[in-house]
């Protein structure tokens, strides 16, 4: 809903198919289903698992807020970006893995190691997603250039901004807003800068 995405992982989004009201209610219903499942956790594990779940949910919200804030921020560092994607993407995977490990009887040390692995895997996933947005194949279900047109601060954009001279940085900031250019021309112009600054 927040990014008006018509497609998610190659399928029509709930938002695009049924509108924002159904999408919001669907999200609420999924959260309630999650808590229903959590209520079935053995009593001795419930505090740890519920704490892990709630922390994960709050961190995902925090990461999403950073992502939206970054769209209007003039300069975002790679460190800030990596923190944002850890919160927005990695902690969901890490929380899920950690809860599974707890339910499976894993030691604290093993839970910690699995969490760290999942964090790194989530970072790799998001960085790959950034690359696919600009250089992927739209037959795989991700429209090419969506992040560019939305003004998203991706790893590619942040790196290009850090390597570019001021005139090129200004062009990167404003190309997506140029009404004289088609979306395809805007995407091509930004990708040309990415390629040049590689």
PLM regions: where:
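All-alpha prenyltransferase/terpene-synthase fold signal
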Residues: 1-198
